[in-house]
Amino acid sequence: VRGLLVVALSLCAAALLASGCGEAKQAAAASVAKPKPTCAYPAGWQKLANRIKAPVYCPGWLPDPLKGQIGGQWNNINSVSADRSYLESFVWQETGGGAAGGELHVNLRAYPGRTKIPTCRTGGSDSRNVPCYADPGRLISANGITTRLYTVNQDADAWHALLLWRRDGTLYTLSEHVAPPLTFDHVVRYLKQELGSLVLIKPAV
């Protein structure tokens, strides 16, 4: 009987040890940090940050085939204004015979030293001043950044879903065109993935 008791106690101890090891492994796995986003084309974004003397956000991911390379194949607008605000636009359009006419269009903007939403002109015979970004909706967060979703936007961001946030006295936006083959909900999912991929690049000078 005593021998059986010793065996039973040994088995219980082994089971408890195994359980503890399993829990330790689970805790260790849970504590492993997610990999940080990576800027695939840092040179152009560093040059932009140096030029405007303010931090910029480099996209680590854009929907295929877009690449977040300033001066690259898909970068159709690379514009910096006198007030240091900038627009970086990346676009792909399906063209040619039999094409369905799909489009992917992503804009990134910043307004250094300004947090107020800028004013735009509506254009046309009844042109008037309106906020460039309007009809704010829900909050969307990723990558430590909390943004507000805007759905009525002007100029290059017209017909785009747009994320807006502020950091250290600067207003930033990230927007994407709602156009085939993407639905509004699909665009919002893409925007959250793009937001999660952003890498902050500070000026070196």
Task: Describe the role of every protein-language-model region.
Residues Q26-S31:
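Extracytoplasmic/lumenal low-complexity Ser/Thr/Pro-rich segments of cell-envelope proteins
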Residues G22-A24:
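Bacterial signal peptide processing site
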Residues P35-D168:
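Short, solvent-exposed recognition patches
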